[in-house]
Amino acid sequence: MDKCKHVGRLRLAQDHSILNPQKWHCVDCNTTESVWACLSCSHVACGRYIEEHALRHFQDSKHPLALEVNELYVFCYLCDDYVLNDNTTGDLKLLRSTLSAIKSQNYDCTTRSGRTLRSMVTADDSFISHEGAQAFLQNEDRAFTALWHRRHALLGKVFRSWFALTPKGKQRLEEERLREVAEQKREEARKRRQQLKRKLKEEMESTPPRKSSRLKQQMQPSPKTELPSVQKMNQKYTPTTKQKPPAPTSIEVCLKKIGNSPIKRKPTVTPGVTGLRNLGNTCYMNSILQILSHLHVFRECFLQLDLNQTQELLAAAGSGKTRLSSKYPPSAVLPKVTQKHTKVQRSLARRQSFSSGLSGGASNSRNMELIQPKEPSSKHISLCHELHTLFQVMWSGKWALVSPFAMLHSVWRLIPAFRGYAQQDAQEFLCELLDKVQQELETTGTRYPTLIPASQRKLIKQVLNIVNNIFHGQLLSQVTCLACDHKSNTIEPFWDLSLEFPERYHFNGKETASQRPCLLTEMLAKFTETEALEGKIYACDQCNTKRRKFSSKPVVLTEAQKQLMVCRLPQVLRLHLKRFRWSGRNHREKIGVHVRFDQMLNMEPYCCRESTAALRADCFIYDLSSVVMHHGKGFGSGHYTAFCYNPEGGNG
């Protein structure tokens, strides 16, 4: 509506929570899709097409005006319409300008009074470099992790006490009691044997020396008579005053013992099950980091490789300081990775012991409290180093939640396209991140190779080989001339397969056929199906063999058909679903149809038989590792979540 009378009464607070990107999520369900901020208080909630938490806030508080955080339009609940006007002080215009500046991290625009928006923030990077905000969220991470520990500890204590009351629990309790009694008896027998040996030794030392060797031999007991003498002495010197009382048999005492005992208790935080805090529309980054950390080969590479000290060494060499530090830590060398395709098995993901913290294991890593939450202090920013430290935190078994400030800061500096708090595409971020990591490894390995230890150079080379080949596959593009049946083959590399939906899902009508779930195998079949090229547009080499290269005769164009097939499978297969269709001339909308897929995928029907004939049947089987899901109806806004298989916990 053109004029809303409720806008004139608006008095916007200067310290509104909407100015903090970390608050751009629903306080009730934590979604970042369709987030509305109340303009009368600091409440932020989701819209009516999600869980209606913003509408419920209006019904409870009677605050009529709310602003959509991403699209920046204002809605009045009392007028039940969108608001186009502003108040006399122009607060809505200023608020929109401020939010746009925060998203793009560009504070050079001016307000109506001529002041720049830079004065509204404390540093160039706004909240990402604000030490107070970082410290506040770091304390929240600690509090959340402590609460997680306490809840799981209390829950485990309750379930252990409850299990002891069941018939199976009583049976197990009795078995444990018998084992403890048997262990107690074995311990007492061991102590008696030690006491007997000590007394025999004291008697032998107190015996006066003999001059005759014959008498010395007589004093030495023979092996045949040693066992009876030990048995007699065992009976003679059995202690009777230090016997322990029998184990308690009362069920109440045993229940108390089980409830309070921390023995054999599993770690409260499963390694890898560490949440990444949304720092302001950063769900695209968090979801990608989660799936990369759950790829066993990729994770182990960056857990062993840390380029921070290497880059500092190269920087010192570039400035003239070429002296090699003797304190440089040697790096472990990864096993050589072959180019042969191997499926991603769960048995491969049974990583070596890296547990520490809650599980009671010792940790040789650095202090986890200071690794990731703070932004990098070094002038030489390294994405490999940030992946190294972040994976250490996520797989330490200590943290239930961590704020990846340093990772976001590095992404902003090294990938400017993702700078700011605007919503981004997760697929594009994954491609850019892998590209930057690859460039960093190549640059580090080739600059001043004599200054880098041989073990570190070898490790960098192997990690670069894994990063380049873990997602790398090859496609066979085959064009068949319909005039002479000649086939032209071209090998093309790929790092992911972009799959389109079948034609029935590209119509705007609400037919029942288009609403049925789509199968992933159906989308793969469409990707590899034969496609007829429109018209006579193909210049066949076979049909033009008799024509000279510089002849004046026109090139013979024929009809043809094209087909894509996989000729080399990657170690990790990435499938990208193209969920958009054109509605009208220039409008795109999302295809919200559910896609069904199994836990295992057989890629043999979609491969070129000539290229993959030598492979075994199990080489075509892939196990599901991770899924990144986009929630939302449009492309301009939404929320990303990641579902990953965790080998430590046995589930996602």
Curated annotation (Swiss-Prot):
Pfam families: UCH (PF00443), zf-UBP (PF02148). A zinc finger (UBP-type) spans 2-99. Its EC number is 3.4.19.12. InterPro entries: Papain-like_cys_pep_sf, Peptidase_C19_UCH, Ub_carboxyl-term_hydrolase, USP_CS, USP_dom, Znf_RING/FYVE/PHD, Znf_UBP. It is found in: Nucleus. Residues 274-652 form the USP domain. This is Ubiquitin carboxyl-terminal hydrolase 44. It comes from Xenopus tropicalis. The gene is usp44.
